[in-house]
Amino acid sequence: MTLPLHPLDPDLFARALPLLADEWLTRDPELAPVLPTVLARNVGQDWHKAGTFRHHLVGVTRTLTVWQQPRDVRLLGLLHSVYGNAFVDLVKFDPAKERARVREIAGESAEHLVYLFCTQSRTQFVQKVLAHALEADGSLVLQKDGQDHVLTPYEVAAFIIVSMADTIEQWFSWQDDIFSRFPDVQHRNQKAHWAASLWPGPMRPSGRMVHQINGLAKALQHPGLKDVLPMPPVFAHCTQHLSAANEAAATSLYWSVIQQDQPLVDL
């Protein structure tokens, strides 16, 4: 059986081409002024999953730019871990002392998003979004330190979109192993299981995470979120379902081809 190739969106392709240049970020009038301050915090010297922390931040921001997100959401992508978070110990700005500095370079709206994204539980956020726990207006209640914190529909939409871009930029089979069952990760004794976390592992594509990103994407169809931000142009603009079984099957088929010893041509 021969499957048709997915049609290429000419407008999407035209937007993506300039972003392949190494210097694209320095030419972006909304993001370029922030870049020197971020780079001065040595983000290019920190390892992060499949590259450096700088590589990751720029990659997330590139995706958000292709998706035509507004300035504050793109800046959230560029700065999404600079206050640190539960996943990575990479504090580039002290949230207790340097919020004013980040507000100065990024603006109040973007800094507010960055601070919330770094200090609220992203695990709890993903769990609740995937569990369809959004309120009727699209807001979401998170618990922190025994108290409820309500994210507005705009914050929820921004966090979903940035979470999608953040995850797809970095996730491969190594994360499947060390963050098994994310967002419901179970603690494992490091001494007993250290070999499973050897980087980079077999470098397979993820066998489960695209399905989870699809779940986040479909949440953007909630009536309270649907028109809040530009809809990412993935999964048929976040309307198409991808089952876990289909993702696993596609990954297995892809990997079986990759591991063949001979190229798929006549010798």
Name what the model sees in each region.
Residues 2, 6-57, 252-253:
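N- or domain-start disorder-to-order transition segments that initiate the globular core
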Residues 10-13, 31, 155, 209, ...:
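Short amphipathic alpha-helical segments that mediate assembly, nucleic-acid/protein binding
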Residues 40-47, 60-203, 209-216:
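Divalent metal-dependent catalytic cores for phosphoryl transfer on phosphate-bearing substrates
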Residues 51, 149, 244-248:
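Short helix-capping and inter-helix turn/linker motifs at the boundaries of alpha-helical repeat units
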Residues 229-242:
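Repeat-mediated protein-protein interaction surfaces in helical alpha-solenoids
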Residues 245-263, 267:
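Amphipathic alpha-helical repeat scaffolds of TPR domains
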